[in-house]
Amino acid sequence: MSHEEDLIDYSDEELQTTDAAATTATPAANGGQAKKDGELTVTGGRADKKGSYVGIHSTGFRDFLLKGELLRAITDCGFEHPSEVQQVCIPTAILNVDVLCQAKSGLGKTAVFVLTTLHQLEPVPGECSVLVMCHTRELAYQIKNEYARFSKYLPDVKTAVFYGGTPIQKDIEVLSNKDTFPNIIVGTPGRLNALVRDKKLSLRNVKAFVLDECDKMLDQIDMRRDVQEIFRATPTDKQVMMFSATLSQDVRPICKKFMRNPLEVYVDDDTKLTLHGLQQYYIKLSEAEKNRKLNELLDSLEFNQVIIFVKSTIRANELDKLLRECNFPSIAVHSGRYKEFKEFNKRICVATDVFGRGIDIERINLAINYDLPADADSYLHRVGRAGRFGTKGLSISFVSTPEDEQVLKDIEKRFEVALPEYPEEGVDSSTYMA
């Protein structure tokens, strides 16, 4: 496919045509049929020179035949067994096959593309081979840190992160010096497009093009336009991988316009809320009762770290101030301040939805929706902060308005669950504390 004919516009007619073509294409390894493995659905994987779908059920990362340096780093991180999504994606991804993957938060999607691209990478000084884009600076930093810990035994690999809101001249200085020029670039679409447009960044050597939380970028027209322009600046023959915790039927065909017969992996049916080990409850109360109830919960519940979600930056700052006045070790995180919380210097974090997607802090085992989100997908991303990688966790949502009650109904309908009311006697800590 040419960049021009497929990426200029997405009309309804185009999307229907693309979706029809994708669903009628015959995957290389399964005769055109979707492979169902419990609640995991796998389709596709092209049979051209980039390789074909490989089915493998691995019991350890060594089964993937990754570089020895990567295996050492994986061992250092304490990982013994790949998650379900890693078992399905990595063996095929390392063959340079395009990948479209939807899996709930905490199932190890980031490690799929980090390990795949590091395994394939042959670093050349002054050349960018891997380009990873995401929609927030927090997520960009987290991905960069994942590359850092898995590439600790690959000293020639250089990684940099670029995002808006900072002086672009600093980024230009990094790109102008061959000694600091990164082989792997992680960033947000707006800043990366500015660097490409001003000819400060050449993408002619990119071999892997990755979008994390792809639905967030491709849903928004401005961000999607930046992604398109960056995509056009990369070679035609490259691997494309896209990942998200939520991937609606409307967004999937848009994603596939960037790909060639991708391996499609959908872990758990996307109509079901399957955050294993996470206990979920709601509490009906008035707006005026929220602060008292929050204080009661923080006093009575055991937790390692808790994240409290509110609907605006102003409310985050106000609630954080109130909690600190009550001597709770709190910090407000809404656009970039999460290092102190991540390093366990603070146990309570008040956050907005910017923090709800992709941010992975392993000690969080309690999530409280002080303000319920506006939609079901945002609820999934929020409560997914607790109970990462299938560990235990607890989420409690405050329901105080008719709009909240409707969102609660939407959540139950969307994910086919019935959320119970929080019991008056509380809950046993053994049900949510690992």
Swiss-Prot record:
<dbReference type="GO" id="GO:0016887">
    <property type="term" value="F:ATP hydrolysis activity"/>
</dbReference>
<dbReference type="InterPro" id="IPR014001">
    <property type="entry name" value="Helicase_ATP-bd"/>
</dbReference>
<dbReference type="GO" id="GO:0006406">
    <property type="term" value="P:mRNA export from nucleus"/>
</dbReference>
<keyword id="KW-0694">RNA-binding</keyword>
<dbReference type="Pfam" id="PF00271">
    <property type="entry name" value="Helicase_C"/>
</dbReference>
<dbReference type="InterPro" id="IPR014014">
    <property type="entry name" value="RNA_helicase_DEAD_Q_motif"/>
</dbReference>
<comment type="similarity">
    <text>Belongs to the DEAD box helicase family. DECD subfamily.</text>
</comment>
<keyword id="KW-0067">ATP-binding</keyword>
<dbReference type="InterPro" id="IPR001650">
    <property type="entry name" value="Helicase_C-like"/>
</dbReference>
<keyword id="KW-0378">Hydrolase</keyword>
<feature type="short sequence motif" description="Q motif">
    <location>
        <begin position="59"/>
        <end position="87"/>
    </location>
</feature>
<feature type="domain" description="Helicase C-terminal">
    <location>
        <begin position="293"/>
        <end position="430"/>
    </location>
</feature>
<keyword id="KW-0813">Transport</keyword>
<keyword id="KW-0509">mRNA transport</keyword>
<keyword id="KW-0347">Helicase</keyword>
<dbReference type="GO" id="GO:0003729">
    <property type="term" value="F:mRNA binding"/>
</dbReference>
<feature type="binding site">
    <location>
        <begin position="103"/>
        <end position="110"/>
    </location>
    <ligand>
        <name>ATP</name>
    </ligand>
</feature>
<dbReference type="GO" id="GO:0000398">
    <property type="term" value="P:mRNA splicing, via spliceosome"/>
</dbReference>
<dbReference type="Pfam" id="PF00270">
    <property type="entry name" value="DEAD"/>
</dbReference>
<dbReference type="InterPro" id="IPR011545">
    <property type="entry name" value="DEAD/DEAH_box_helicase_dom"/>
</dbReference>
<keyword id="KW-0547">Nucleotide-binding</keyword>
<dbReference type="InterPro" id="IPR027417">
    <property type="entry name" value="P-loop_NTPase"/>
</dbReference>
<feature type="short sequence motif" description="DECD box">
    <location>
        <begin position="212"/>
        <end position="215"/>
    </location>
</feature>
<feature type="domain" description="Helicase ATP-binding">
    <location>
        <begin position="90"/>
        <end position="265"/>
    </location>
</feature>
<protein>
    <recommendedName>
        <fullName>ATP-dependent RNA helicase sub2</fullName>
        <ecNumber>3.6.4.13</ecNumber>
    </recommendedName>
</protein>
<keyword id="KW-0508">mRNA splicing</keyword>
<keyword id="KW-0539">Nucleus</keyword>
<dbReference type="GO" id="GO:0003724">
    <property type="term" value="F:RNA helicase activity"/>
</dbReference>
<comment type="function">
    <text>ATP-binding RNA helicase involved in transcription elongation and required for the export of mRNA out of the nucleus. SUB2 also plays a role in pre-mRNA splicing and spliceosome assembly. May be involved in rDNA and telomeric silencing, and maintenance of genome integrity.</text>
</comment>
<dbReference type="GO" id="GO:0005681">
    <property type="term" value="C:spliceosomal complex"/>
</dbReference>
<dbReference type="GO" id="GO:0005524">
    <property type="term" value="F:ATP binding"/>
</dbReference>
<keyword id="KW-0747">Spliceosome</keyword>
<keyword id="KW-0507">mRNA processing</keyword>
